[in-house]
A protein has these predicted regions:
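Terminal accessory/targeting
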Residues: 1-78, 94-103, 162, 210, ...
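Catalytic domains of cell-wall/extracellular-matrix polysaccharide-remodeling enzymes
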Residues: 137-243, 247-263, 269-270, 276-277, ...
Length: 283
């Protein structure tokens, strides 16, 4: 179920959300992150400090004719998957579909996963959200400059266009998160701030996380380890965006997924896509 909001209500909701949860989880639309890097998450795959600079995309409208929003669940979780599609993705989709749970996929199109790109159509048809991640996921390329970043996004959308309506994808996740430090090696200290401003000016929303599965740190963690990581990172949080991966090297994430879903169900969480949890203001 999609939660629609008027622009006025949306701004108020986000203000309250940032005040009530930000101190605990350090998040917003694009600022879901912990104040300390979760144990085992690579620095290059983390958002190490809260980002308090989020503003609504330029497409936000002051028109207040939208229906009143449906109430948000008190406890909700967004399961998000980066770096797919790959040979792991069918197992992830199978687990999600069996459980009746919708997720959000921040996809890549590197040229090495071409044969799996049709899975994007399958995921979208099943009601999962497709969102943008990167064409190459090469930090040294995409973070050379703002122009380099947007060329990567344009290439990604071009490669996705046979499988999904790419011009309708307005959510993205920066490789490494919105306040990553790895980008400084290539584009300087101010690059991420510039990109965040450009993203919102263009009408996109960037999305981070406040729960890390630690499934892409190397060493091929077991399904049990991934499950325990998520339970630990969730802690007492009641509004969670979980970072997982459906890459070729994270097969155990798919194995852990049924137990992860069941744990959240047992603890009273509703499952939302990112666009359901944090919808863009309607025009």
């Amino acid at each position: 179920m999609t939660f629609f909001r008027s622009s006025k209500h949306q701004r108020l909701w986000w203000s309250l959300l940032l005040l009530s949860v930000g101190a605990a989880a350090g998040f917003g639309l694009g600022i879901f992150c912990g104040t300390e890097p979760p144990v085992g998450c690579r620095e290059s795959d983390l958002t190490p400090v809260p980002d308090e600079s989020f503003v609504f995309p330029a497409s936000a409208s002051s028109v207040e004719t939208s229906p009143e929003p449906e109430p948000m669940p008190e406890k909700w979780v967004c399961l998000t998957f980066d770096d797919g599609p790959s040979k792991t993705t069918p197992d992830v989709l199978s687990a999600l579909n069996r459980a009746g749970v919708k997720a959000t996929f921040f996809v890549v199109a590197t040229g090495n996963n071409d044969k799996y790109l049709p899975l994007i159509s399958e995921a979208a048809a099943a009601g999962h959200q497709i969102a943008l991640h990167s064409a190459s996921h090469e930090y040294s390329d995409i973070y050379q400059s703002a122009d380099a970043y947007w060329k990567d996004i344009d290439l990604l959308k071009e490669r996705l266009s046979p499988y999904v309506r790419a011009d309708g994808l307005w959510y993205l996740r920066f490789p490494g998160g919105s306040t990553n430090t790895v980008s400084r090696r290539y584009g300087g200290r101010g690059l991420m701030q510039q990109l965040k401003e450009e993203v919102t000016a263009k009408g996109y929303a960037y999305v981070d996380w406040n729960v890390c599965a630690e499934d892409a740190v190397g060493g091929k963690p077991s399904a049990g380890t991934i499950f325990r990581n998520i339970v630990r990172e969730t802690g007492e949080q009641t509004q969670c965006i979980v970072l997982m991966h459906d890459s070729a090297t994270t097969r155990t994430t798919a194995e852990a997924l049924p137990d992860i879903i069941q744990w959240y169900k047992d603890n009273g969480f509703a499952f939302l896509t990112v666009e359901q949890a944090v919808p863009l203001p309607t025009t």
